[in-house]
Regions:
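Alpha-helical segments flanking ligand/cofactor-binding loops in enzyme cores
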Residues: 27, 134, 175-178
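Protease zymogen maturation seam
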Residues: 1-39, 52-56, 156-158, 170-171
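Subtilisin-like serine protease catalytic core
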Residues: 27-125, 139-142, 155, 181-184
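Conserved residues at the C-terminal ends of beta-strands
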Residues: 1, 116, 147-149
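Short, flexible loop segments at the rims of nucleotide/cofactor-binding pockets, characterized by
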Residues: 16-20, 121-123, 163-166
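Short, acidic/polar
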Residues: 125-133
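Short acidic, glycine-rich surface-loop motifs adjacent to enzyme active sites
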Residues: 134-165
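Catalytic-core regions built around general acid/base machinery
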Residues: 167-184
């Protein structure tokens, strides 16, 4: 049955992404033409190591669909020399290697923002995240994808969040995320 699905699908997902796509019936969306086109997705993470040279992003790069990048940690436009986690998250959305790996929205446009300093946990990263969300909003993002969360800051333990703090109203990143959601992001 699986091979019949692959033959009928718009994308040849290969063995590496079919189960992940199928988990949410994503191939149905791809088959009816919903592949992320006209969507603007901001990814806030710890870096996008070498995304410009990896085969998985050939389509995104060739079509100029990375619309903006910014490193809020080092305050520069380049995000390619830092940690790979953001690139890995980016691949689950944007990758397109026929027969090997296809992301969930391989035709979307992207904003890649490094807000996480992977050298340690510092409270400034929450502020970086909010700045990234604000920039995403100003650039017209429809979606923010971020796997970051903040509770403990070993370098500054007095800034740790208590359980009571994590009510969605007290820490800057929760307030920023709430404001983005109220704007429809």
């Amino acid at each position: 049955a699986r091979n019949k699905n692959l033959e009928a699908d718009y994308y040849n997902y290969g063995n590496n992404s079919y189960n992940e796509i199928h988990l949410h019936n994503g191939e149905f969306l791809h088959n009816i033409g919903l592949r992320g086109q006209a969507m603007r997705i901001a990814i806030l993470d710890g870096g996008f190591f070498n995304y410009k040279t990896l085969k998985a992003f050939d389509s995104v790069n060739a079509e100029g669909r990375v619309l903006d990048t910014w490193d809020f940690v080092n305050r520069e436009a380049s995000v390619v020399e830092d940690h790979p986690h953001g690139m890995q998250c980016f691949s689950t959305i944007a990758a397109n290697i026929p027969g090997q790996f296809t992301g969930k929205a391989p035709k979307a446009n992207f904003f890649l923002y490094r807000t996480e300093d992977t050298n340690g946990e510092n409270a400034i990263e929450e502020h970086n995240w909010v700045c990234g969300a604000e920039r995403a909003d100003s650039m017209g993002a429809n979606i923010i994808s971020s796997s970051l969360g903040y509770t403990d800051f070993p370098q500054s333990p007095t800034l740790n969040h208590t359980y009571a703090d994590m009510n969605g109203n007290n820490n800057i990143s929760a307030i920023g995320a709430d404001l983005a959601a109220k704007k429809g992001i």
